[in-house]
Curated annotation (Swiss-Prot):
It holds the Pfam family Fz. Residues 1-18 form the signal peptide. InterPro entries: Frizzled/SFRP, Frizzled_dom, Frizzled_dom_sf, Netrin_domain, Netrin_module_non-TIMP, TIMP-like_OB-fold. Soluble frizzled-related proteins (sFRPS) function as modulators of Wnt signaling through direct interaction with Wnts. They have a role in regulating cell growth and differentiation in specific cell types. SFRP4 plays a role in bone morphogenesis. May also act as a regulator of adult uterine morphology and function. May also increase apoptosis during ovulation possibly through modulation of FZ1/FZ4/WNT4 signaling. Has phosphaturic effects by specifically inhibiting sodium-dependent phosphate uptake. GO terms for cellular component: cell surface; cytoplasm; extracellular space; nucleus. The FZ domain is involved in binding with Wnt ligands. One of its GO terms (molecular function) is Wnt-protein binding. Keywords: Developmental protein, Differentiation, Disulfide bond, Glycoprotein, Secreted, Signal, Wnt signaling pathway. This is Secreted frizzled-related sequence protein 4.
Amino acid sequence: MLRSILVALCLWLRLALGVRGAPCEAVRIPMCRHMPWNITRMPNHLHHSTQENAILAIEQYEELVDVNCSSVLRFFLCAMYAPICTLEFLHDPIKPCKSVCQRARDDCEPLMKMYNHSWPESLACDELPVYDRGVCISPEAIVTDLPEDVKWIDITPDMMVQERSFDADCKRLSPDRCKCKKVKPTLATYLSKNYSYVIHAKIKAVQRSGCNEVTTVVDVKEIFKSLSPIPRTQVPLITNSSCQCPHILPHQDVLIMCYEWRSRMMLLENCLVEKWRDQLSRRSIQWEERLQEQQRTIQDKKQIASRTSRTSRSNPPKSKGRPPAPKPASPKKNIKARSAPKKSNLKKSAS
């Protein structure tokens, strides 16, 4: 079984970025506060833009949930009204499985019909994904009895981060043993590294979330470059190593240049972290312009080479060898010439 959807796809709830600038937020819907997940995002699957709107809409099902007509009804409703917020599925939040919807509907619709109600169209099961063919969640995919070594730390009112206690091997990993290479903030470095994001941020917290993972929480102030939307709020930067390189300390105001990987913002050894200076930020903007110019030049050269290659294939060069040899004379004339003397000999003998 997978460990809390925490989850069907090893998705960790500590990640709290948002879509189009909207961060994940703590679940505030009373009916859903005891679900195995504790952060959600809006709009939900029913297009409610705020949790306040979702609360008003979900209240109509409270009596149905209270009579316990189905063991999965509450789970299904919360998966629709307060979907799980995970970094890997920001643009298309995970839906409940079709089988969960069908179980809730089949269990509760007979009772609803007794009061002249039918299963609502807005909760139709037909469009929901099937477990074997798509990404979806069901109660069976979630372990609710988490091990004792797992606890939740509230970093901000709107973000939860999971932390595990370390085993003996992890405790022996001292930061003093790590030797980080200094990356110099130069144009040559910027052009060669081709970073995917550049931000101005303040370091809020640095914490080890496993033997080979360090999470650095930063408060994003300015965004100079990014491949995907970065919210101006607190976001986690992931270091997938036992060493945190480059070294940074909490409460520093810094300029960070690094990479995104599978929608995660990474903080890796070959990335650049410098104390914030206006002059350096202006340089980074100029470096990005040079990088774009360099990439356009490379692209233009590739297009020219491609066109030249296509032209040479369609119009092959003519051969410059020796001229062709002349054709031999027709053999018929030679045959006639040879046969002429034979006729004259026949005439002489006849005479």
